[in-house]
Design a protein with these regions (language model features):
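Conserved N-terminal catalytic core of the sugar/cofactor nucleotidyltransferase
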Residues: 1-7, 15-18, 30-110, 116-120, ...
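Conserved beta-strand scaffold positions in the cores of enzyme catalytic domains, especially
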Residues: 28, 77, 138-140
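Short glycine/proline-enriched turns and hinge-like loops at secondary-structure junctions
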Residues: 19-20, 150
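Conserved core of the sugar-phosphate nucleotidyltransferase
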Residues: 118-150
Length: 150
């Protein structure tokens, strides 16, 4: 079954102020010294997803196209009709991909996490994809919590 990556990158730039602003939200920052966060997320999906989509808001779509030039086709940059957070973002991507490609596996990642072990993360994604294929179920991955937090 084909695997499509989805990068959630619609944040408004409010959580990492003053580095991140509404004019330059976190996903467009280069915090590692290598790439912008959104491009690192796209790269993280390589070897797992055959194609990658980015969900962003309409006001950031042009900058997203510029920032991801050559990595993601223009029609793979999805503009959220309204900012409604994670569930709506994933639902919008799922409906768009379902209409275009039918029943596939979607691998959804945020644009802004720090990932120390890129290859280990990629292997975890591959295991999750295999589990989804095998069980025809929703698979989630995450870190084991060590304390309660929001």
């Amino acid at each position: 079954m084909k695997v499509y990556g989805v990068v959630m990158a619609g944040g408004g730039g409010t959580r990492l102020w003053p580095l991140s602003t509404s004019r330059k939200p976190k996903q467009f920052l280069n915090l590692s010294g290598k790439e912008t966060l959104v491009n690192e997320a796209i790269d993280r999906l390589s070897g797992v997803a055959q194609e990658t989509f980015i969900v962003t808001n309409a006001s950031q779509a042009q900058e997203m196209l510029s920032q991801t030039a050559g990595r993601v086709p223009e029609d793979h940059i999805l503009k959220e009709p309204a900012a409604r957070n994670t569930a709506a973002c994933i639902g919008y991507a799922a409906m768009t991909i379902l209409k275009k490609y039918g029943d596939v596996i979607m691998c959804v990642v945020p644009s802004d996490p720090y990932t120390r072990d890129e290859e280990g993360f990629r292997q975890t994604l591959k295991s999750a994809v295999a589990a989804a294929e095998e069980t025809d179920a929703l698979v989630t991955i995450g870190i084991r919590p060590t304390f309660p937090s929001t």
